[in-house]
Amino acid sequence: MQQKTDVILIGAGIMSATLGSLLKELAPEWEIKVFEKLASAGEESSNEWNNAGTGHSALCELNYTSEKADGSIDISKAVKVNEQFQLSRQFWAYLVKSKLIRNPQDFIMPLPHMSLVQGKKNVEFLKNRFEALSKNPLFQGMEFSDAPETLKKWLPLIMEGRTSNEPMAATKIDSGTDVNFGALTRMLFDYLKTKNVELNYKHSVENIKRTKNGLWEVKVHDMNSGKIEHHTAKFVFIGGGGGSLPLLQKTGIPESKHIGGFPVSGLFMVCKNQKVVEQHHAKVYGKAKVGAPPMSVPHLDTRYIDNKKALLFGPFAGFSPKFLKTGSNLDLIGSVKPNNVLTMLAAGVKEMGLTKYLIQQVMLSHEKRMLDFPAFIPNAKSEDWDIVVAGQRVQVIKDTDAGGKGTLQFGTEVVSAADGSIAALLGASPGASTAVHVMLEVLEKCFPSRMIEWEEKIKEMIPSYGISLTENPRLFQDLHTSTGRTLGLNEKETVHN
């Protein structure tokens, strides 16, 4: 028997949670069903231990600002990422203000974001970056210093025991955040439950196919009872993290062809000495080694997990053929199809450097990983640190005009059918931080005829929707202050509601 509904969301992560929340505000009468393979929400890529928890707004991530041939800095990508994070901030503030979610300090905390570099050339790059960003209102309040005494105040743990005379510099901005995406995801699904969204955990989606009358039929395995169910919907969103690509391929839509996925696993070192944890209070991003991929940017992060302060260092990359942490070793080989095999092979040839890098990373022992610490913590002791396996990220491989056949993509990407009846989210960073922007893109692609009708409500929830904050500094200032107040970020006050 087929069970009909309006919307099916596959995967109970931050993306489905965000899209479901937007739809329930815009079209409250629509029936929504969620299917999640695991036992609860936010357990894969959205889980707090499976991602870096950075509110990515390009305040400290150096890979969002590239150096041009003439030495000037291109800040366009940084501005774009920051603008996108502001949309998330505004939507979260709307949810808190409307009492749809409570206690924002359980998912977002104010935390300085810093960039740290060593060596004369890198110091020059950071100074140029600081000067370029400082002209933009989104980055106001950023400070730069190459004075050792200032760096000792900003970064006591990092500067302690440092003997090298090599030039160092840092930038610091206090408006950064640490975001617990696992906690936020669980809050959003708790809210959706009150809106009669049907949440089905331990339900694995086995197949997706088009019916004769233009609906989508989703075949679901109920892992609790062992039964197979068939559900139909007018619109399906595939938000299954690394598991999205295999499901997208099952749809057979033309847009799913010539796309591959390359899985990369991440490892972090977590500090178990609370005295060391208390000596650091920032997210500090360094610069990737020459030739290393963007996902290898080292960072030392204060995190707030279960309302307790933690300290993580990494990431160290790894390789596993699984597309999900809880996936199968056959995921990668199973994703190779006649329509994408040449794309995948081309990427294999192009990305020999990445493959070599990942093999080297996999071979690292605990003690070898500790050798990466002196750049960040000269006095780090091996016994103070344990390894934590983070989530899998599946980088998109596709044919592009700029990069040619088999080009590895490092962002997130929405793939949708021409008629807007189904969409999938592929890719990785900046991911969760830009969830609201990405899900608005899904709405624009899949419900174009409803956008005029929905615009007023969208602007009530997300006031800067469709507006450049860079070009409207006054609006940015007003929204930054008001959302900061609602989310408890302006001062470290606790918001109870």
Curated annotation (Swiss-Prot):
InterPro entries reported for this sequence: FAD/NAD-bd_sf, MQO
Enzyme class: oxidoreductase
GO MF assignments: L-malate dehydrogenase (quinone) activity
Coiled-coil stretches noted in the UniProt entry, renumbered to this chain: none
Catalytic activity: (S)-malate + a quinone = a quinol + oxaloacetate
The keyword Oxidoreductase belongs to this UniProt entry's keyword annotation: yes
This protein's UniProt keywords: FAD, Flavoprotein, Oxidoreductase, Tricarboxylic acid cycle
Cofactors named for this entry: FAD
Family per similarity comment: Belongs to the MQO family.
Entry protein name: Probable malate:quinone oxidoreductase
Organism lineage string: Bacteria, Bacillati, Bacillota, Bacilli, Bacillales
Gene giving rise to this polypeptide: mqo
